[in-house]
C-alpha cells in the first residue's frame, strides 16, 4: 500500500490551521524548516495520528537552518509523545535520535550514489524504522538505483526534478509513500496531493476489477 502525503510548509503557527483541510491525505507532512522557530509540541499533538514532522537539514533540501541541538531536543520530545517524524540518517546517528517506528531518510540532490553507499547509510535503521526514505536527483542511473532499492521491504523512493508521473510509477512498483504538495511545491516533481490520490485510487480500482490489466 502506498500512503499519500500532503506536504505543508509551516512558516508560522497560523499555517497549522490548514491541517484539517488536508486530512483526506493519509498523512500531512509538516515542513517545520520553512520557519526559523519550531512550534510548541502541544499545538500539533492533537494531530499526532495523521502527521509527519520534518525539520529538513539545509544540505538535504531544507529551507532554513535550525540549530542542530534544538532540532535534536525537539525530535526527542516528539518521540516521547509518539509523534511520527522524518529524520535524516546522518543526523540520527550523530545526535542519537530515536528511530524506532520513525521515517529515516537520505537525500541526494546533486548526484546519483551507488546502491552500496545508500544501503550502508541505512543499514542500521532497516529493522526498527517505520520506513526508510530515499530521494535522488533525476540524473543518469537514478531509475536503476531506485528500482533496486524497492527490493527492500519498508522503503519509499522518490526521484527529484522529473516528470511527476514517475513518482506514481514508483508507487505502483512498491514505494510506500508518495508526497504531493498542498498548493506550494516542497520538492521538484510533485503533483498536488489530491491529484496523486485520485490517480492511485483510480489505478487501485482498475486492479481490483481487472487484475490482469496491471499484472499482465
UniProtKB/Swiss-Prot annotation:
Disulfide bonds: none
Domain of life: Archaea
Active site: 107, 133
Residue numbers binding 3-dehydroquinate: 7, 29-31, 56, 167, 186, 190
Alphabetized InterPro entries for the sequence: Aldolase_TIM, DHquinase_I, Type-I_3-dehydroquinase
Subunit (UniProt): Homodimer.
Name of the molecule in the record: 3-dehydroquinate dehydratase
